[in-house]
Amino acid sequence: MGCGEGELARGLATAGYDVVAIDPEAPEGQIFQRTTLEDFDDPEPFDAIVASRSLHHVHDLAAGLDKLVRLLRGPLILNEIAWDRREPMTPEWEEEHEGLHGYGTMRAELDARFEERFFEWRPYPVDGEEVPGLGFRYVGVSRS
């Protein structure tokens, strides 16, 4: 979910995994679909869903996570940003991230639907430097 230019998706496909990679600006190719989570559907559940720096962009987070629960039979693997934890919070940073989900919102919605199996804070690159405690990795399995 949120495959960007598709490096990870291509790597997984080359390693022999069946991959469906979605992004509104996904590249051309058999494994890629230009769509959003909101518009995506598949009749078969996925063994895992990987989302890297994309969950905070989902417009209706609750509905999006409910859809992931329906689409998933294995773990949800996230590499995300807690943009609202940046100190100092510059006006430019706030404006750039306005309308995106912050960490508290994402975490509350995840906890309502998934059981955490792994979590860690990670540095996140901002303006050429690594900002500690701004990125996070999360693995969860559906509570249903």
Label for each model-derived stretch:
Residues G99-F118:
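Short alpha-helix
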Residues I77-E94:
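Conserved class I S-adenosyl-L-methionine
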Residues E5-D39:
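Class I SAM-dependent methyltransferase SAM/SAH-binding core
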Residues G2:
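Conserved S-adenosyl-L-methionine
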Residues R53-S54:
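Short catalytic micro-motifs in class I SAM-dependent methyltransferases
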Residues V58-L68:
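A short, conserved alpha-helix within the catalytic core of class I
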Residues D127-S144:
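Core SAM-dependent methyltransferase catalytic element
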Residues V50:
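A conserved beta-strand element that flanks and buttresses the S-adenosyl-L-methionine
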